[in-house]
Structure formats: structure tokens, C-alpha cells
Amino acid sequence: MQFSEHWLRSLVNPPLDSESLGHLLTMAGLEVEEAVPAAAAFSGVVVGRIIEAEKHPNADKLKLCKVDVGQDELLQIVCGAPNAAAGLRVPCAMVGAKLPGFDIKAAKLRGVESFGMLCSARELGLSDDHGGLLELPDNAPIGQDIRNFLALDDTLFTIKLTPNRSDCLSLAGVAREVAALTGQPFALPQIEAVVPAIDDRRPVVLDAPDGCPRYCSRIVRGVDAKAPTPDWMKQRLQRSGVRSISALVDVTNYVMLELGQPLHAFDNAKLVGAIHVRYPHAGEKVLLLNEQTVVPAADTLLIADEARALALAGIMGGEDSGITLDTVDVFLESAFFAPAAIAGRARSYGFVSDASHRFERGVDFELPARAIERATRLILDICGGTAGPADETVAKDHLPERPAVRLRPARARRLLGIDLGDDAIVRLLEGVHLSVEREGDALLVTPPSFRFDIEIEEDLIEEVARLHGYDAIPACAPQGSLMMLDRSESGRSAWDVRHLLAARDFQEVVNYAFVEEAWERDFCANAEPIRLANPIASQMSVMRSSLIPGLAANLVANRKRQQARVRVFEIGRCFERKADGEPVAGFQQPLRVAGLAAGLALPEQWGAASRQVDFYDVKSDVEALFAPRALGFERLSDPALHPGRAASILLDGRRIGLLGEIHPVWVQRYEMGTAPVVFEIELDAALLADLPAYREISRQPAVTRDVALVVEQALTAARVIEVMQEAAPTIVMGMELFDIYHGKGIDPGKKSLAFRVLMQDTQRTLEDAEVDAAVEAIVRHTETSLGARLRG
């Protein structure tokens, strides 16, 4: 909402400069979004009266003017404005004046000396109008500084209101707040009931009292719709961001800005019979003032007469019943429309009006009668005419209630952390017209009709804080005792996991839990994802069941920015439907950790060979995350992963995640460049850690033996090691695969796996006999269990 500081100070005038006033409003919750001068900076411009305006002797389009600026002699000024004429009062820039962008000097124009310049509105920076001189009223004092005459030393405030503070969508509302905050007197213009001179009325029927429980109306006959709007009113409207249209329209807009009550003026001659406030009939249409024809929805409130719909109630009037410059008789409307009946209706038709903006937030339901009296008096003063009685039609049972809200001052003090006495709290609340009664240790506070935001105790506590001043609440650091808590050695935190992955050169990302349906289908084979009822964007319409699609999207975004090496991870929740038969139906949200590596295995540098990251690089990252716990890996078929480069991750025989290279189809479709390698693991599994186990470091020499076994092609090395360990005696410290061989000497469908077996004792040096016996036991057990044979 935009308004003039001068207008505000005509209602309440605190001893504050413009900057301090803006700060006061902001700290009270009425955020000042902008405070700008009403006019550009200029000086040396006064009110001048053109005494003569003759044709320039050397130019057809110029005039030679004699101008009275209150000095002993008339000024000779050459002017090219088409409306320059004798008798006209205009702004006159004297020699030495400083205008926006240039200074005024004495000059010769087509051979004739000119001592100044007559100004248009654009040359003064007041508007874009440059079609002619800015014409001033005949009562403008000659020689007076134009800034003083037009009150240009003004500030235009624009405040950003929260939806609950509709009471401040008017000058009266803002002035009421300033008065309460500064203790200054607040005075609206005196509003007295207009004595009716005629008895003309028009019946009003409230067919929808739930949407409109109060409707005030009045007929004013014999108005002069062509009467000019007073300059003071046009100025206030302009500085509030409202364009002057005609005197009748300007009056309704002015009262809305001043008091906060939207009004509408109908051409009474265009109305038929009684006025009905009702919901639309099937197929009904309304041509609005913005030249838009709408078919009102069933829940849109209408103003209608006996013949047709006239207007969208509380939103916009209709073209067929609107006032024009030929209007003689006016039917004034000032009503209360319930917020629920107006909210969202205008936006559903593709626009928002000043009236709908106010009504959907809440307008004082006691204000319509006062507003119609104020508008009537202004119309009579400006346009003349005779007024009929002000009629009021009310459905009292449907008017909003204002029940008292119980406030406990002790609780307010505890929540706010300030020591405010009960009397101080009462004084603050009564300052904004809240009625307060004492009830023991509590206060019963009744909000006024214009406050729609006071419903519970917390609203009142917030009001106390706001009026006391948020900046007046002392800053106190929170205090609390800290205790050293035991930390289990068998677990670790998500931060530990983050640090481990960061140490492996991964960077953390945080993605939306909403993903594109195609990504969910391609990367998760999820044909029935969990859909959002109201997605924030079409490409974010489903909940993710895996973290991998989000990481893939991060890769694509980085590829488009020429990033050759990408290593990212994320810890977050996924969303899955619970399996049938679970005790509670619905969804589950498991926490997972996932990573993606693409591009170079190592940052490019002269001392290391350049190669692309592969399956085994990321496998080692995952194993490092769980070390010293040993992981198992099994071949995996997954639609998102390469059919020959994917594995399930096992911990203690249980599947906890997956690892693999993205399928070539998706790499090509989503333009990922080189194929990335990804992993995804249950976070709970990554948080488990083995208790530290200490053992003696042997001083004795270790012995190694190499064993080559021929096994079935499909058998994994991990399975062979598992079987070998079953028969290994205590002297065996470890086994590792160091060679795989296919070819000459190996039967088709077979392969040779070579293992290095490490043996050591803590007390003595091992003898060849017991080393050979250990190897023989391992080989024999493997032959029996897996059908392996020792390679000769």
C-alpha cells in the first residue's frame, strides 16, 4: 500500500522525521518497503502568470510570453508549449533554477532573449506528461515557490502488509497505529450524517446473508458528473498510486484509501427494481468495468437488480450499470462482504482489484454506514445534488462475532522475556482500541470490529511485543547447563559419515525430495510413484524412492557447465509405500546415503596417469566407509545400472544397498557424458561400527603360500574365500585374490583363481610342516565344498 506522508500527518503528526517514521512502522510490523520523494529535486521554480503570449517573430511554433512572477518587472520567456496563453498560471523556472538534468540560463532563441522557462510536468519530474505546460489553479499565489504550493516536499511510503493486518490498508488504519506507538492524538475528518433532502430509496434484499450480512445504500440525485475533482484530492490519489478518473469515481477511491471501506457507485437510471445480493443463476454473464466478460462460478457473490446481474460483489462493478460523465442520479453502495465469500474469487477470473484485496482480508463490518456518509458529503460538495436517506440492510446473525480473548500477563512476561506490568500491558492494548477488563490474574480482551487477527492468547502476546517494540526487547543469550554425554563406541553419527565421504573427495548436495516422474520411472523402475496433490512444478510432481535420480540430475547440470570431474553424495529420506500386510498402512521414509562419481578418477596432475573412474574405485570408497567391517558383494540386475557392472552390497549376509555403473541407455538419453558410478546404502547400516578389538602384534616372521584353484566360471572369488576361511586354522591371518586366469590349460566354463594366504603365530616361528598342513586343509575343504581342484 502506498500513501503520502503529508496525508498521514494530517491525521496524526508525531515528532519524527521521515526516516524515523519509516523505522517506527517497520518495527511495528508494517514493513516499509520503499520511501521515495514525491518529486525530483529541483529549485528556483515559482508560480508565474502569463500576461501576454504573442507569436515569435522568427518561429511559427514558438511564442513570446510576458510572465508575472511577483517581481517589479515582467519576464520575457520564449515558450513552445501549445497551451501557452494569456491569463494562465504555470510553473516558471527562473534564471539560475536547477531542474532535473539541467540548469536554466538566460539564452537567445531564434534571435530573441529568454529569461527563464515555463515548465511541463515532465520537466519538473512530476509525471510523464509533456503535451503542454502544467496548468495551475487560478488561486495559485504568484511568485510562490512551486514546491511549497504543490506540497512537493513529501515522502511516498510503500508498506508491505501481512495478510492478517487488513486494518492497515487505509490511512486511518496506519494513523491509528502511529498514534498508539507514539502517544500522539489521532483525528479523522469529522463525519456527520447527511440530512436527506429527498425520500428516494431502492429496496435491498440479502439473498446470501452468509456472504453479505450488511449493505448500506443511498440515492443521490442531480449530480454533475463532469465536475472537476479538486486538486487536493487528485494529489492524494496520485500519491497513493491511484489514477484520477472522474469526480464520482475519485470520491469512492478516496474514501477507500482514507477509511479502508471499498464503495461502488451505480448509475441509478440503469437499475431496475430492488437490489439483490445473491449467488449466480446458471449461465449468467457479467460484463465488467475492465471490459472482461465472465461467467460467475456458483460460489461467486453477485450484486443484481430485478433484471440482471450488475457486478461481482466486493470485486468489480459492471459496465452496463457503471457511472459515466452523463450520469445524473447515483446509487451508492457501501457493504460488508465476508472474507470467505471473496477470498480467491478475483484471482480465479484472472485479476485482483483494490476492493477484493481488502474484502478477502477483512474490512471493518461497522464501517459501511460511516463510509457512505463520508462519500455522500464529498459528492455533494464536489458534484452537487440532493441526497436521499442512507438505508442499511442487516442480517445480524451473520455478522462476525468478537468474543473476548483471555490473556494471562504472567504468561506474556514469560514468553516475551520482559518485565511488563499489568497496567503497562493494558495501556498498550487499549492504545490500539482493544477493550480490556480484569478478571482476577487475567485480562479479558475484546478486539474491535476492524481487527480480524485477534483470536487466541498468542495473538495478544504478539500484539504486546509489537506495541512495546521488538527493538526494545533486550537481547539475552540463552542459558543452560551442558552435560558430557556418553557416546557409544558401537555407533557413529550421520556427521561422521559425511566427514568420511568428504575425506574420500565427495562433495555433499541437498536435493529436493520432489522429482520428475520420468526419472523415477527410468532409474527406479517405479511405475506407480507417490504423487503430490499440489506439485510446485510439473517436473517435480512425485516423491523420490531413491537418491540416485537427484544425483544424476546434479551430474547433468555440472556437465552442462563443463565440469569434467564430479563426485557428490547426499544423505536424505526416500519415500516408499509400505508393503501389504504391515500393521499400519501408508508410507515409510527410510534414510539413505548415496554417492556418484564421474569423470577422472583423480584430479588431473602431472605425476599421475589420467583415467576415468570405474566400478572398483567407488567400491573401494564404499568399503572404506565401513572399514574395518567387511562387506560382501553379489551380482545384481537393476534397470538403472549396467547389466555387467552392478552389485548388491551385503553386510553380515544382509543386503544393505547397491553399487554400479549407470546403464548406457540412461547415460545417452540424459547426456551424462562418461558413465557415472553410483552407490546407495541404508544409512542405519552405515552408522553401525564394530567395537574396537585389540590383539597382540606378532614379533614372529610371517609365511605366505600361493594357492591356485580351478573353479566354475560363475563362482565368485568372495564365495571361494568364504569357503577357504571355514577350514583355515588359527595361524591363517588373511587371504587375498591376486590373479584370475582363463585360457590354455583351463577347461571351458572354468577359471583359475590364485590366492595368497598369509600365516603367522604370535609365540613362535612356523614350521614348514604345519604351514603345508594348513594349506592342504584349506584346499581339501574347497575341493569338497565347491568342486574346486588345485591347479598343477
UniProtKB/Swiss-Prot annotation:
Domain FDX-ACB: 698-791
Binding residues annotated for Mg(2+), in chain numbering: D453, D459, E462, E463
One GO location term (cellular component): phenylalanine-tRNA ligase complex
One annotated GO biological process: phenylalanyl-tRNA aminoacylation
Main subcellular localisation: cytoplasm
UniProt key word Ribonucleoprotein: no
Cofactor: Mg(2+)
Main enzyme class: ligase
Occurrences of domain B5 (ranges): 400-475
CDD domains noted in UniProt: PheRS_beta_core (cd00769), tRNA_bind_bactPheRS (cd02796)
Subunit record text: Tetramer of two alpha and two beta subunits.
The protein's name: Phenylalanine--tRNA ligase beta subunit
The organism of origin for this protein: Aromatoleum aromaticum (strain DSM 19018 / LMG 30748 / EbN1)
Gene name of the encoded protein: pheT
